[in-house]
């Protein structure tokens, strides 16, 4: 027989702290996704640039982002930069690392979206007198975003999961706060169960 007495009232009393961690998680997820998308929107253009430096820079970024663990990227941001006297908070380290990772993956997602757009649209836009920037921003890019919406939502979900790695460097996002609270109250099941529900409810409609 299970000899465990559930004490949900303990969780209820500390629910504001859990929600504080959840808000931090959501904030990091949204910001890292926006920053990642903005960077990716530039990198995807540089991929086809005539400038070899820009092409190689983009290739290197994508390679590092996709072929190294996200945890290592966080370590490099937090501890690696510290070795050179650049000390940043755990919040900035996680935000920067997740945004860096997002940018690498989103660049490839956008590249696939651009490949699906007919070249005739470029010609039509030029026929209307639009320059390259206007064609990119007002004709091509909106269609690409619509095409890649589903893959981008998957990346958003990954970003939220990735923020939990912040616990390693002391960030009290949802997972970090949950671990801290259960260590104080010795109610691991209740706290982790509620944390899991918060994650699920945050992402279930995406």
Residue ranges and their predicted role:
Residues 1-204:
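Transmembrane alpha-helices and adjacent helix-loop boundaries
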């Amino acid at each position: 027989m299970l000899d465990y007495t559930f004490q949900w009232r303990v969780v209820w009393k500390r629910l504001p702290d859990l929600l504080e961690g959840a808000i931090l998680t959501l904030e990091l997820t949204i910001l890292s996704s926006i920053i990642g998308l903005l960077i990716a929107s530039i990198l995807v253009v540089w991929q086809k640039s005539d400038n070899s430096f820009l092409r190689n820079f983009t290739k290197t970024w994508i390679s590092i982002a996709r072929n190294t663990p996200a945890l290592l990227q966080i370590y490099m941001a937090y501890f690696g930069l510290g070795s050179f006297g650049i000390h940043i908070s755990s919040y900035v380290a996680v935000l920067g690392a997740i945004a860096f990772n997002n940018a690498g993956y989103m660049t490839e997602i956008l590249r696939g979206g651009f490949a699906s757009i007919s070249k005739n649209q470029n010609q039509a836009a030029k026929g209307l007198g639009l320059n390259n920037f206007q064609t990119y921003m007002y004709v091509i890019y909106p269609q690409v975003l619509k095409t890649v919406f589903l893959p981008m939502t998957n990346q958003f979900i990954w970003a939220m999961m990735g923020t939990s790695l912040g616990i390693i460097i002391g960030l009290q996002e949802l997972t970090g706060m949950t671990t801290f609270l259960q260590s104080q109250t010795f109610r691991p099941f209740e706290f982790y169960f509620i944390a899991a529900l918060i994650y699920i409810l945050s992402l279930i409609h995406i």
